[in-house]
A protein has these predicted regions:
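Surface-exposed amphipathic alpha-helical segments
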Residues: 122, 127-148
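Short, solvent-exposed recognition patches
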Residues: 9-115, 120-121
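Gram-positive cell-envelope targeting signals
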Residues: 1-7
Length: 148
């Protein structure tokens, strides 16, 4: 009987849920005030012309790009520290570290499509997660050059 009671308590505890740490804002300037650092990213990416900008206090800024039918193209993240902040824990067939300009990045994907790119500059971590957008090495290089 004691085991049953513990199981019930755990289930009830999980139903409460964790509050979403992200605060949705209108501009990168607002996001930088929340996160405590700046992020600059391209205004659009291909057909993905709508942005949702969100921030976690003293931690992270995330920009999600959507197309006209609200399909997610990709998301770009920047956070304090040097950890992998992609949020993507899938196993990929292709994982390689490449040099893009002066930056060493790790690209993960399969069959020529890059799904995740992560890098850090010693102070901040960055991540690009592809949704429906197709990313190749050239697209990644252009994005990285425009993410600060």
């Amino acid at each position: 009987k004691q085991e049953t009671a513990e199981t019930t308590n755990v289930t009830q505890g999980q139903d409460v849920g964790v509050p979403n740490p992200y605060e949705i804002v209108d501009t990168l300037e607002e996001a930088s005030k929340i996160a405590g650092f700046n992020l600059s990213v391209p205004a659009t990416y291909g057909d993905y012309k709508k942005q949702v900008i969100q921030a976690i206090e003293d931690d992270m800024i995330e920009v999600i790009y959507f197309n006209d039918t609200d399909n997610e193209g990709l998301r770009i993240r920047k956070a304090i520290g040097t950890d992998d902040i992609s949020g993507d824990y899938n196993e990929y067939k292709d994982v390689e570290t490449v040099k893009v300009g002066d930056v060493e990045v790790t690209e993960k994907g399969s069959d020529g499509d890059i799904a995740v790119v992560i890098w850090n500059d010693g102070t901040y971590s960055y991540a690009i997660d592809a949704g429906e957008a197709k990313l190749n090495s050239e697209a990644i290089a252009n994005l990285i050059a425009n993410i600060k």
